[in-house]
Amino acid sequence: MEYRLFGQVTRALMDASQAPADDIATRIDALDWNRKVWSALATDCALPENQLPMELRASIISLSLWVGRHSSAVMRKEEDFEPLIEINRMIMQGLAGRADAA
């Protein structure tokens, strides 16, 4: 389920990165969706009942904060989409590895 969600939001980021510069709605929608996904992950990692190792939880929360900052910079056209896409791809690889190990 998480893998599919990351695949969908990453595809939206890729599409937004190729959209015309004046297509602000596509950019905003993709960045906002990605930010919401990461925010939900961070919120879940902050819960005491979360079963992930503390170090991994802290890393996910840290990445979520970075995603928020970088997304704002992308909207200001100070940064590009590629780092957001790459991080999501790395998460997808980790999720695929977890599914293979199960």
Swiss-Prot record:
Entries under Pfam families matching the protein: FlaF
Entry annotated with the keyword Nucleotide-binding: no
Stated name of the protein: Protein FlaF
UniProt entry tagged with the keyword Cell inner membrane: no
Lineage start: Bacteria, Pseudomonadati, Pseudomonadota, Alphaproteobacteria, Caulobacterales
Function in brief: Required for synthesis of the 25 kDa and 27 kDa flagellins and appears to be important for flagellin assembly.
Any GO BP: bacterial-type flagellum organization
InterPro entries for this protein: FlaF
Keywords of the record: Bacterial flagellum biogenesis
Gene: flaF
